[in-house]
Regions:
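Amphipathic, charged alpha-helical segments and their helix-to-coil junctions
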Residues: 1-152
Length: 152
């Protein structure tokens, strides 16, 4: 059996590229939240100015239209950025799954194992059947080979 989640969390691919992608996603989400707050605050401020009679209805309408354009632009940009991040996450996940699959195939190339299971489905098993460390080592080996091949 293989502890797939452990392999994916501990492999070099995740440590180098996965963590960076996760940080990039979190940074984008914080940026979106901040931008939304700023636009909402701008709209509230405009409403307060209008209610206090500090701005004409004509100016208020012009500023409201300006805010609406900013919101539309923000939403469009955020959507594009989210799609890019989704695609990057999709590619990253596929690469990780491919490395895992290739590692298991290489480890079992001699047909030493008749069945290899994901440990998440196990309730109890003999720990001598755990091939997680071997799979992790092979995943890292394949990742290093892939990185070396990309540089050529």
């Amino acid at each position: 059996y293989v502890q797939v989640e452990a392999v994916l969390a501990q492999c070099d691919l995740y440590k180098t590229e996965g963590v960076a992608l996760q940080e990039k996603t979190e940074k984008a989400q914080k940026s979106w939240a901040q931008r939304e707050q700023n636009l909402q605050a701008e709209a509230v401020q405009l409403q307060q100015k209008y209610e206090k009679g500090l701005i004409t209805s004509r100016d208020a309408q012009a500023q409201q239209e300006s805010i609406q354009k900013k919101v539309a632009s923000y939403q469009s940009n955020a959507q594009k950025e989210a799609q890019t991040l989704d695609e990057e996450n999709y590619v990253f996940t596929n690469r990780a799954q491919d490395l895992l699959h290739r590692a298991v195939q290489e480890i079992n190339s001699g047909k030493k194992y008749k069945l290899i299971l994901n440990a998440s489905a196990l309730i109890d098993a003999d720990t001598t059947l755990n091939i997680t460390p071997a799979v992790l080592a092979k995943v890292n080996e394949l990742y290093a080979a892939d990185k070396k091949a990309e540089k050529k």
